Amino acid sequence: MEQMKPCAANSPPLTPIGFLERAATVYGDCTSIVYGSNTVYTWRETNLRCLRVASSLSSIGIGRSDVVSVLSPNTPAMYELQFAVPMSGAILNNINTRLDARTVSVLLRHCGSKLLFVDVFSVDLAVEAISMMTTDPPILVFIADKEEEGGDADVADRTKFSYTYDDLIHRGDLDFKWIRPESEWDPVVLNYTSGTTSAPKGVVHCHRGIFVMSIDSLIDWTVPKNPVYLWTLPIFHANGWSYPWGIAAVGGTNVCLRKFDAPLIYRLIRDHGVTHMCGAPVVLNMLSATNEFQPLNRPVNILTAGAPPPAAVLLRAESIGFVISHGYGLTETAGLNVSCAWKPQWNRLPASDRARLKARQGVRTVGFTEIDVVDPESGRSVERNGETVGEIVMRGSSIMLGYLKDPVGTEKALKNGWFYTGDVGVIHSDGYLEIKDRSKDIIITGGENVSSVEVETVLYTNPAVNEVAVVARPDVFWGETPCAFVSLKSGLTQRPTEVEMIEYCRKKMPKYMVPKTVSFVDELPKTSTGKVMKFVLREIAKKMGTTRLSRM
C-alpha cells in the first residue's frame, strides 16, 4: 500500500467555484436570486451570467493572479461576482462600502487591483478613491440597480468608467470554459481585516480552504437542500462567511438585500419563506426592537457571531420565532469554525441558563481540525476550568495562506503549527470555548471591527490632545461603541468639547469608527513602566452604562 500515491484522477484541485456549475445542472430551474420587485434568476441563468462576465474579464486581459475588487452591497451583481471573478482566474477582493475614500485607495494600491466593480451608490466613493492614486488605477466597471430609485441612472462621469456590468454580460461568450485553478492552494479571495492606512492586513485564502469552509458551514448549521437565505450579512464581511458558495452547493434561493431595514426584512421573510439568515448581534437587536414585527408563522434560523447577544435580546428574538445559533471565526478562518453546538438536554434549563450557555462560542465545527487555549509564554494548554485565560489558537484547512506582502505578520500569526488569533479566552470543563477579551484591542460595533489604535492615531492628530486611549463601551443596540479617554495639553486657551472632538473624528474616519463617547481626564492610568492600563478604562466605560437606547 505504501506505493499508492495521489494521481491526477484522485487529486484534482478542490474549488468552491464548481458548486455553481453543479447547481445549474441539478437545480437549473430553481430560483437562485430574488431582489426587489422584479429581479428573479434561476440557477441556470446565474451560471450563464457568471460565465459571460468571466469571459469578458478574460477578453480585456484579466487573468491568473490579477486582483479584481468589488465595491457593492448585497445585490445580485455582488453575489454573481463571487463566482464570476474566480471563474476568470482572478483573485476576488470584496471591499467594505462603509470605508472612506482614503482607506479604499490605500487598499486598492496595496493589493494592486486591476479592475474595480462599483455599485451605483458607491460611485462618488470610488471616484474620490481613484483620484488619490497617482499610478496604475484599476479599470472601473459601473453596476446599475434598476430596483432602486436613481439606481439605473447613467454613470455620473462616464469618462472614468470603461464598462458597465451589463456591457460585460452582453459581450461575454456563452461557450467560455471557466478557468480552473492549477492547484487547490492557488489564491481565490483577498479580504482586509480592517481599514487601516498604515499597515493593511490583506488575508489571502485558497480554493481548498474556501471549499472546505463552505461545506463545513452547511454541515454545522444543518442547512438542507433548497434553503431560502436572506442576505442580512454583508458579503464584503469575510465573503459572507463563505455562504455565497455554500448556498449554491445546496441549490438555495438568495434573497438579496441592499441595506438593513427591519420592517422590510419581516416582509421578505413572509413573502419568500426565508429559512436562514446571518448577521452580527446588532441584527437581533434591530429585529426585536422594532415596533412593526409580528410573530413568525414558521421558525427562521439566525446564525450570529462576535460579541454574544445579551440575554434579554436572545429571549426577545426567540419569542418572535427566531432560532438562534452562535459561533466564532475570523477573517483569517474564512468563516465560523467554532460553534455553540446545542445539546437537547439544555432545552429543559431555565431561560437565563440557556442564554448563558448560548453566549459561549462553543467547540470546533465538524470540518475543522483543532482549537485550543494556550499559555502565551509556555505554549501549553491552559486548565479547562472556565477561569484560566490564554490565547486562542487553531488549525484547520480553512486557515488563511497568510497576509499579503506581510511576511513578518504571517510568521507571527502562523507558528508552531497553529494560527494564533490574538484573542483571549477560556475553555470550560465541558470543552466549550468562551472569549474573554481581544488582546489586539478590537472593538466590535454592529458587526464592524474597529481597531482602537486607528482611532487613537486620528485623535492624536488633534493639536489639543496630550494623551488618548480608546476602549469599548457597552451599547444596547450596537453591542459595543468606541469610547475615548482624552487628556488635554496644559495651557490651552480654549478646551475642545466632547461634541467638537467627535466631529473632528467624523471628518477623518468612517462613521462606524467614530467614538460615541469622549471622556476628558487629567491623566490616563498607567503601570509603573508607563503603559496605559486599558483594563481600568474598560471598567470605567462599563460602569458608564450603555451608550444610548436609540439607533443614532
UniProtKB/Swiss-Prot annotation:
Its main location: other. PROSITE patterns: AMP_BINDING. One of its GO terms (molecular function) is ligase activity. It is found in: Peroxisome. CDD domains: ttLC_FACS_AEE21_like. Its EC number is 6.2.1.-. A motif (Microbody targeting signal) lies at residues 550-552. It holds the Pfam family AMP-binding_C. InterPro entries: AMP-bd_C (IPR025110), AMP-bd_C_sf (IPR045851), AMP-binding_CS (IPR020845), AMP-dep_synth/lig_dom (IPR000873), ANL_N_sf (IPR042099). Keywords: Fatty acid metabolism, Ligase, Lipid metabolism, Peroxisome. Expressed in roots, stems and developing seeds. May act as an acid--thiol ligase that activates carboxylic acids by forming acyl-CoAs. NCBIfam families: PRK08162.1. Belongs to the ATP-dependent AMP-binding enzyme family. This is Probable acyl-activating enzyme 5, peroxisomal. It comes from Arabidopsis thaliana (Mouse-ear cress). The gene is AAE5.
